Amino acid sequence: MPPKPHTTDDLVFLRGVQVTDAQGIVEFKTIFPGHYPGRVNHIHMKVHVGGGATQPAVEDAGHPGVAVYAGGHVAHTGQLFFPEDVSKFVEATHPYSSQKVRRTALDEDMVFNGQGGAESVAKLTPVTSTQLSDGYVATLVVAVDPDATPKLVGFGRPGRPR
């Protein structure tokens, strides 16, 4: 069992909120995620229904211009995974290769194995055919019941989306 992670609820780097279009599609640009003890590279995702962006609360004053999503309910919590060969390739490049913490393989990851991770592996398409380091486009279809109110699974407590 990996060590219990520290809470990162107050951190805003590599966090974001996107609103879907009329077809329920969302797009965002990010970097390939790193890893931490006991976990494979992944991106957390949470689907909120019925809320909206608001002005930052007083406790968020240190992050000017950061809107806070409020209201509604959580209809889905999950994780987006990447094909093992791509994760290995990326981890062999700088700055990922300087990481001293052992990377957990996809087939060793407790969340991937215990929570249907095989259905959450993104399809990756290289941006260019000549230079893989130019990046990838990741595609994942997630079917969500907007009326669902699933229980929180895992350790820690949920953070506020920002």
Question: Each PLM stretch: what is its role?
Answer:
Residues 1-107, 145-151, 155-158:
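Beta-strand-dominated extracellular/periplasmic modules and repeats
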Residues 111:
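Short conserved active-site loop signatures built around small residues
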